[in-house]
């Protein structure tokens, strides 16, 4: 029953989005309107002992779609492999609209990727959750470290480490078997936090 409700909510949202797109077309605004589909979080659907929740720092809650639609300005159906972050949206929009601003952004434009040009991936980055579950994390292409700052309501250990190459679904915590990796990633993460808070 719960799955059917979730599926119905997704179908309802699809129908609402279709109405918006049809209205833009009817008003002749498709070429003057950039439409962005994204989300602030994914969902745990039986993942990691969490049921229909969106807390935690596993990829099922962190990875969300980012779809840009701008008729006759952006290529339709183009899929870009890899990942970007929501901090990349603003610099991307300004870049594709040709708006130059003299402001620093943490994010980077996706326009080179849209044009088929290479862009070096961000090698590692900080992730956090600041809701009723307070956690810090550090992600590299190979590893994800999660450090809980308080009690975990899903009874997870204080430190989690996942090998994203061997275990992309993050099912096997290997923190105890890799204490040296935990320490290296913790140092990088805390150095970033200290720099950010200055």
Briefly describe each language-model feature range.
Residues 1-33, 96, 183, 192, ...:
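A long, amphipathic alpha-helix that forms part
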Residues 22-78, 85:
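Histidine-centered active-site microenvironments of extracellular/periplasmic hydrolases
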Residues 1-5, 70-74, 165-171:
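Short glycine/proline-rich turn/loop motifs
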Residues 41-47, 88-90, 95-160, 164, ...:
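C-terminal cap/loop subdomain of S1 sulfatases and analogous C-terminal strand-loop tails that border
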Residues 65, 69, 189-198:
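A short, conserved beta-to-alpha structural element at the edge of catalytic cores
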Residues 172-180:
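Active-site-proximal N-terminal segment of extracellular/periplasmic enzymes that hydrolyze or transfer
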Residues 17, 35, 40, 65-66, ...:
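Generic structural signal for small/hydrophobic residues in well-ordered secondary structure
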Residues 3-13, 29, 56-64, 74-91, ...:
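A short beta-strand-to-alpha-helix junction
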């Amino acid at each position: 029953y719960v799955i059917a409700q979730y599926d119905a909510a997704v179908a309802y949202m699809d129908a609402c989005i279709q109405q918006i797109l049809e209205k833009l077309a009817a008003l002749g605004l498709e070429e003057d309107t950039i439409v962005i589909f994204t989300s602030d979080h994914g969902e745990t659907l039986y993942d990691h002992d969490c049921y229909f929740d969106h807390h935690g720092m596993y990829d099922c809650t962190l990875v969300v779609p980012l779809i840009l639609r701008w008729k006759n300005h952006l290529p339709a159906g183009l899929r870009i492999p890899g990942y970007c972050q929501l901090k990349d949206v603003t610099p991307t929009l300004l870049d594709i609209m040709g708006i130059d601003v003299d402001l620093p952004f943490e994010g980077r434009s996706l326009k080179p990727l849209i044009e088929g040009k290479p862009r070096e991936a961000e090698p590692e980055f900080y992730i956090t959750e600041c809701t009723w579950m307070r956690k810090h994390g550090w992600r590299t292409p190979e590893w994800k470290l999660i450090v809980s700052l308080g009690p975990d309501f899903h009874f997870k250990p204080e430190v989690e480490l996942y090998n994203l190459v061997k275990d992309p679904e993050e099912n096997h915590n290997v923190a105890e078997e890799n204490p040296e990796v935990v320490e290296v990633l913790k140092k990088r993460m805390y150095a970033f936090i200290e720099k950010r808070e200055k």
